[in-house]
Amino acid sequence: MSRDLQLGLFPTEPVADLMPDLVPDEVDIYILNLSGGKDGPRAAAVALDAARAVGVEDRVYTIHASLGPLEWPAVTVDGVRYPGSSELAALHSRALGVPPERHIEVRRTHELQGERVPYDLLTYIAERGDWPWKGVLPCRSDWKTGLIYGAFSAMVRARKKELGRPVVCANVLGIRADESPDRKKRPALRTTTDNTFRVVHEWSPAHQVTTQEVKDWTDEQGLPHQWCYDSHPGAGDWKGSSRCSCSLCVLANRRDLLLAVRRRPRLAELYALVERVRGVPFNPNTSMAELIERAARPGAPDPGVVTEDEGPEFDALENAVQAALKKPAKRARYVRPVPGADALPGSCDGCASAGPDQEA
């Protein structure tokens, strides 16, 4: 793929129409969010074109907020290795032409026995005694948005001192209208933070691009996509998972969950352990125990590949979760709304999106 990725495949709105209050050369820092999924690169490419058009490409950074072993891992099939989400985010950044030194990966940590170690979301859930759900999504705020803001705090402080004014940031997301009703209503451009340190404009330049257009664009550009999207690694048929978020996301649709349970049985069993010990179902519509049982029935999605989930990183997660479950839950469960529909909403609305009003 060429370093300067050209977007001539689809007619899109002119950049000026997409961002009437955002002047490309007045943005001090472009933050391009890459999850390893299909939508981030499509949005990032538009933002990169805008920055390049006015000669400020050096202000562009890509960032990936890693969820560790809860993300889709790398797999090797028939001697071919297919990268996991974190690795793929870095590959996407390079393919788009962003220098490696301007790609940032962040992951939440905490102190354990005098050293900083990864602090995974499932450990937090086990400690807390309940699962994320709409309106209470630590997977979005504490494991993504907060870390992303924090990663740029030192840069913002330095730039503010240099400029003598708040630093203008464009937080570029791959949110698209056809992912969910909530995302359809979400504006393509909005200001999420405005204080003495920074002004953050959340920009979703691929908001009106359809799912099929994203897939076609990805294939046409020769951009590698996450293997979880396919019926089996290397198929290139987009007949696997519909979304690439956490492997087992509480907001995923039922087919995606059944497919993930079959592809990552060891992770599913760990989720089921948390569910069983804390006595709280995975989400209001279904339990992980039920999903595991349904995934074993005839007619369940063919996994195409089954990951072993072996290695020190997963073992550390398992040990941390088991240790957390030996202690009382840190807070009482709250009452979650129970939707009547059998299928779950098909999107994790706002992953790494609504930035907290944090100062640098």
PLM regions and their residue ranges:
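Nucleotide-activated chemistry modules centered on ATP-dependent adenylation/adenylyltransferase
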Residues: S2-A360
